[in-house]
Amino acid sequence: MDLHYDCAESPAAEQPSGKINKTAFKLFGKRRSGSAMPTIFGVKNKGDGKGTGNIGMVRSKTLDGLADVVLESNKKEEPCTNAGAGQLNTEKSPKVVTINPDVSSDSSVAKSHSFFSLLKRNGKSENVKGELAEQKPGSRQKRGLKGLFNSMRWSKKDKSYKDDKEGASENQPGLILPSSLTASLECIKEETQKPLCEKEKSEEDIPADVPSVEHSGDVNTSAEENPLNGCVESPCPALITKEPQLEDPPVIQQVDNLYQLPDPEVETLPDNKDEDVTGDIPVNTVSIVEPECDVGQEIAAPDPTTVDPPSEPSFDRICLMLADVTSLKSFDSLTGCGDVIADQDDDGGSSKGSKVVPGNGKKVTSKKNANIVAYQGGGEEMASPEEADETYVQELFSMIPQSEGASEKPEKVNGTTQVTAREVKCSDSGRDRNTVKPSKLRQVPIRRKERGDQNSKGNEKRQCHRNSDEGYWDSTTLGQEEEEPRSVGKQALPRDSCSGDALYDLYTDPDESIPKAQAEEPPVSHSHSKPLSPVTASCPVKTASSNKESKIPISIKHLPVHTTNQGIDSGSGSAAGHSHPVKSELPRTKIPVSKVLVRRVSNKAITETAAGKRAIHDPARKHH
């Protein structure tokens, strides 16, 4: 506590600002005795040309590991002249310790005494290590920032321990390697530099370990020691020739028991060792055989004396090389384009083929072809459109045996009458005028002529867009309503393999006429004209198909065509009469009927969402 009070009282007594800063920086200089940092602080604090002399002082006195001389010289330069500082520079470390109390007494400053006492304690602790410290600080001063970290006391202790350990390791290098088979490469390099000394020591002190150490030295420096082996091995050829012959058979037995290497390589081990002692065979032949022994030894952990540790760096490199190569091979095998994709496609192709047609023998052959194509990169062809075509064609023939003729005749009629939209609509309008009341229905065909003359295709696309907003299958048949009946028998079948929508287009052609009429008839606003609108849409087309009474739902909407041709009253009765057998036919048509009904419900307005049956019965109710 006295020291702290002295430190507090002293600045009030003597020039507080300058001296406090100097002492503070000098403490840092003491803690970092061998570095350039205290000199930099000193230059900043002392500024008036005194920094040059002080730098020299720091360098001269830190050789002893004491920064007290610098502090004392700085304290004396303030009350005294520079000559006193020069005298202190010439003084040596044993005198410095005796001068410290004199300096504190001459300055008569409690602050300086407190700091000096702290510095003296550190200095005395360093004087205990004076001899060890004198050797190193000269080199530490020149290292720059490294000296800052090395100047600390704990770092010095660590280095002293490290130096002791290094000395012990240099004195006994042969003891470090047997400790572990995976010794660091530095120890191995040290042994490669000093193999001859190890031979002499091992031969004199440890005769049992002679062959292993000798072989390691020969393997490492077979090219370097061949001229030297004649000089060094001359005093001890007896030990070399006698002991390996006695100890090689147990080594071979250990290799046979532990490593289980192939016989020819094991038999070459004693020959290689006996010839490595003579230095006749190069190192490469030994390195080819011994890495496998090293692997076995690392696994089984036998006596380290039988191992050639210098071969570990090269063996480790080879292992890393092999590991990289094997990793690349495994990566290619796991993610190789050809094999894995072929396997996946095989699985996918077999599953697809089995799902499409499980029983046909032709599909089995097509699976093989598909696999070959997939392996070559045709993964997209695994869908096998040919198989799909066959299946859909079979379904068509099974589902529609009677509708083939019906579908062919509409094609012919379409080829003659519906070459263009104008001819179709003109013929429709002509029959409608002759058969139906002219007062109300003439307006509809006239508007159809105008639209057919001007915007036939544009209106169809717009109506299909409206249907696409409401319906589901209309989007697939945009702008092809007139051409689809042509492509029913020829073009629809190849499309079925890809999408399967053309089959539904077969049955949904009449449905598309309904939304057309509904979109075109809002100005008429008469309720009974709406069910008659499909008659005006495609009368000549469906008369031929309805005479056959095919199972296609075309007959649902175009049976009223006969009613209009025969008369309004008879048409209502016939519509009511034909609607019932149509109901019985609906379950017979498999998929398209359900799709058509769904589309009719979705395409009609909210007021007409009841069903297609009500739309068919509406003319009968309203004419009666």
From Swiss-Prot:
Keywords: Cell membrane, Lipid-binding, Membrane, Wnt signaling pathway. Pfam families: AMER (PF09422). Residues 155-168, 195-204, 422-435, 450-469 have a biased composition (Basic and acidic residues). The gene is amer2. Residues 77-111, 126-177, 195-230, 342-369, 397-588 are annotated as: Disordered. It is found in: Cell membrane. One of its GO terms (biological process) is negative regulation of canonical Wnt signaling pathway. It is a peripheral membrane protein. InterPro entries: AMER. The keyword Lipid metabolism does not apply. This is APC membrane recruitment protein 2.
